[in-house]
Structures are given as C-alpha cells and as structure tokens.
Amino acid sequence: MKETNSFSQKLKQFVLLFFPIFVTQMSLFAMSFFDTTMSGHASPIDLAGVAIGTSIWIPVSTGLTGILMATTPIVAQLVGSKKKEDVPHVIIQAVYLAICASFVVILIGLFTVTPILNGMRLEEPVERIAAQFLSIIAIGIIPLFTYTVLRGFIDALGKTRTTMIITLLSLPINVVLNYVLIFGNFGFPKLGGVGAAIASAATYWCILIITVMIIRTKEPFASFNIFKQLYRPSLSSWKEFLKLGVPIGFAIFFETSIFAAVTLMMSNFSTTTIAAHQAAMNFASLLYMTPLSLAMAMTIAVGFEVGAKRYNNAKQYGFIGIGLALAFALLYSILLYFFDDEIASIYTTDIQVHHLAKEFLIFAILFQISDAIATPVQGALRGYKDVNVALIMTLIAYWVIGLPLGYILATYTDWAAKGYWIGLIIGLAFGATFLLIRLFQVQRKYTTQNSRS
C-alpha cells in the first residue's frame, strides 16, 4: 500500500489489491466447491452427508477465522502509522491464540457432534458420512487457523498477490486428492464424501507449510523477522486482539451460521431437497466470494489510510468497493437467470435434484444486491476498527428477522423449503440497509475530526 493523490490512482491500487484476494478466495472456496460437486457425483447420499457436515463445520471455522482476521486491520494501521517494529509481537500472539482456539474447537467437537447429528433424525447413511467428515476435517483446524493469522499479516502489507500464489499452488493438491479418494482411483479405497474431508485437511497443512517458508525467506516479509523471537504469551495483548476480533468473528458467525442453520432445519425434508438446497447454496456462496474479497480489500485500504489519518482517502475507498460490488451483483444476477439449467447440471445428474436446484437458484438472484452492500460495508467498518454495532445489526438481521420469518414461511405456508430462502433474503436486505447507515455515520465522524484538526 502507498499514498495516492487521485481517484484514478485509488481505483487502480484497489483493483490491484482486490484481484489477488479474489483469486485466493475463489481458490479456497474451490476446495469446498470440489468437495460438494465431486461428492454429488459419487451419490446423492454422499452429497447430503457432506452438506450436513459442511453446514456444521463452516460456521465454526469461519467464525473463529473471523476473530483471527483482526490481524489485518491491526497490522494495516500499524504499517500506516509507521510502527513496523510492533508487528512481530502482534503476529506471534495471534498465532498463540489460533493454536489455543484450535484445541478448544476440537475438544468441544468431541462431545457435541454426535448429539447434534443424532438430534437431526437424518437417514443413517447420511448421518454416518457427516460424522466421519467432521471427525477428519478436525485434523486441518490447527493449520487453517494459523494460516489465517499469517495471511492477515501478508495481506495487511498489501502483498495480496503472495497469498494468491500460495493458494494456487495448493489447489491442485486438493483436486487430485479428491479425485483419488472420493472415487477410489489409482488403487485407493472409494471413500465418497469422507475422502473430501481427508483431501481438505491435508491441503490445509500444505498451505501452512508454504506460507511459513515464504514469510521466513522472501521480502518484505522476512525483514519483519516474525519468527526470530518467540514472545511469551501476553494476556493483555490477547485481550486487545480479542476486543477487535471477537465482534468480527461473531458477525461472520451470525451470517454464515444462518445458512448452516437453514440447512440443518431442512433435515426434516427429503434427501433430494437437502441435496438441491446445498447445490444452490454452494453456487450462491461461490458468487459471494466477490463481495467478500472486496470487503477484505476495503479493510486493508481503509485501515491503511485511517492509520495514516487520511480520512477522506479512506472514505473514497469505501465508495469504490461498494460501487464495484454492485456492478458484479448485476452481472451475477444475469448469469443466474439465464444459465440456471447449466449451473444445476454442474452439481448433479439426478433429475429431481436438478429440477429443485434450479428453483432455489432463482432465489439466489435476490441475494446478490444485499450481499453487494452488506459485505463490503462490513469490510470498511473493520478498517475503521468499528465492529460492535455491525455485530448487533448482523445478529438482528439474520437471527431475529431472517431465520424466524423463514421458519414461519416454510412451516405454515405452501412455500415449504423455499420459505427459508425468502426469510434469508428479507433478513439480508434489512442488514444491508442498516450497515450502510452505520458506515455513513462513521465516515462523517472521522471526516469531522479531520476538519477540526
């Protein structure tokens, strides 16, 4: 990141920041994408089992990685304010937190996964695959969480191309392992959805190893000497980190868990409905990588400018990110409307699943506009380190409005499973509106402070 003087320079720098993040997020999502699509071609039961396992794993992993994402705005502001010497201590303390969080998640999972799955009244093969999926994916928790911290450091320096290269190097490993283990090729046993979990866990370890090697040997990362000194754990540092990270993590958890909750509540419907819902939701999540990547770029750009006390520049980056998100939303809506048949065919050859997935995809169109506003706005707010209000707004939008309304529509109207999608759409729209209002308030506050000073 560097200081810019014109809107065109900001737009160019933002795009150069965003594009590698986008490729990275798409590559990381591709692991889940290939898990789902390749499991679906193994059998509808494997697809449903992976869907249930993923619906439990994703909210937990994204919520906790969200806490660790506090690394990015903290480091970005330190770099913007010329306090490079403080960065190694922040990163090492965050790594300690990541490892501790990993063991806590694994311990909790040992006692909760089986009761949760038993209470869902799933078909026995689906429950078995989901349980095995979750048991095996736990092997990848430590490297995933640790990598999240190190990636936050790399991205905060504006070197998003590096994380892109790391992920692109790792993706082929995941695809090959999926091909070998899901379908039983090259003499390996045919494991179905369970093979997808093994592939993902192994890939997480590969990503961490590559990242550590780059930080130790390549500039500008090596000049920070991140691993030169293993600082003693500092509870005060953990407290400061968590003060920012916990609201970020819970906001992400509330958003991702609402979709997982819908998938779990759909366990009362048929395996066909679960599989179709998962296929449509998986593709909608694929499109979500764009506003998510824009949000991550906004956190870096806004955080850097706020650290340097250039508040008008931070405001302009906010407008750039939201404008690009809305443009992509229009493009994706057209894609979903005209190519729903082709999209559904990616996930399944089962006629019933294919037909129902097409119906769900139409609702995904309505997700696009709300996501294009809410997600980048949250990224900008994180750059300002303004996270508490966003947490409350997200909780209300998704869990007080979206899910209860979806349940009512699914249970007491003819919309059935589609009622959940309608509830989510209304909740997302509410959240987007109020998050945008909050961003305007924060921008006005900082701009006013700048004028007075």
Curated annotation (Swiss-Prot):
Transmembrane regions: 13-34, 49-71, 92-114, 129-151, 164-183, 193-215, 244-266, 286-308, 317-339, 359-381, 388-410, 420-442
Any GO BP annotation: monoatomic ion transport
Transmembrane helix as UniProt keyword: yes
Entry membrane topology: Multi-pass membrane protein
Subcellular location: Cell membrane
Function text: Multidrug efflux pump.
Classification via PANTHER family: FMN_FAD EXPORTER YEEO-RELATED (PTHR43298:SF2), MULTIDRUG RESISTANCE PROTEIN NORM-RELATED (PTHR43298)
Protein's name in the database: Probable multidrug resistance protein NorM
Phylogenetic lineage: Bacteria, Bacillati, Bacillota, Bacilli, Bacillales
Gene of this entry: norM
